[in-house]
């Protein structure tokens, strides 16, 4: 089942996550939460913020999720395609959970949270980048960019955690491509935003669009893998 699920998750990546940064620091934060009260009902919440300004919000059931860009980062036609892709991803994501539940009895409610982003420190210091995944309110795994490795965020040793780390650390996409997304794409975008904060025009618009698409593809590819591994194990110790 896992070998079937992982490629689907890796290829179905349309979603984004984020957290509000109200103090206006030079950073990009992304947060996404999926709340399953049972196998058939899910409520999504998410947002993206850049330098303390919300850029996107997402909320609602998978059958009628409201997705809004709060700043005109994409032209209407382009944004409509993004919305459609994201809606498709959410429906597929819910379908995967139901499929796994049919084969393995999962404990509900189930809440999955991913939080990632980059923060630019004072000049001369290294940027702080991160990706954290929590399940049912408890820290699960997180990414360490220094060695491009995932590590456990729980003191409880279990087969589920061990298996998850083995899988996440086995793929270039979930290691080196993720590090590149966080340390390069994310950081460079924030830097460009700072230098062109008061500039309006096509160059800025293209940068925004590129970053938005990067967030949609990059963040949920990794989150989907982590979530899929957890669901495939049924949330139980192996």
Curated annotation (Swiss-Prot):
Locate the coiled-coil region(s) and give their ranges.
none
Which residues does the annotation flag as glycosylated? Answer: 47, 64, 136, 172
Q: In which tissues is it expressed?
A: Expressed strongly in the endothelial cells of arteries and veins in heart and lung, less intensely in capillaries in the lung and skin, and not at all in the endothelium of small vessels of the liver and kidney.
Q: Which InterPro entries match?
A: Endothetial_C_recpt, MHC_I-like_Ag-recog, MHC_I-like_Ag-recog_sf, MHC_I/II-like_Ag-recog
Q: Which GO terms describe its molecular function?
A: signaling receptor activity
Please report the record's description of how this protein sits within the membrane: Single-pass type I membrane protein
> Which cysteine pairs are covalently linked by disulfides here?
118-186
Asked whether the UniProt record includes Zinc among its keywords, one would answer: no
Q: Extracellular compartment: which residues?
A: 18-210
This protein's major location comes to membrane
Location relative to the cell: Membrane
Any idea what job this protein has? Binds activated protein C. Enhances protein C activation by the thrombin-thrombomodulin complex; plays a role in the protein C pathway controlling blood coagulation.
Any one cellular component term from GO for this entry? Answer: focal adhesion
Annotated GO biological processes are: blood coagulation; negative regulation of coagulation
Q: Tell me the residue ranges located in the Cytoplasmic compartment per UniProt.
A: 232-238
- What is this protein's name? Endothelial protein C receptor
The secretion signal range is: 1-17
Keywords assigned by UniProt? Blood coagulation, Disulfide bond, Glycoprotein, Hemostasis, Membrane, Receptor, Signal, Transmembrane, Transmembrane helix
Which residue ranges run through the membrane? Answer: 211-231
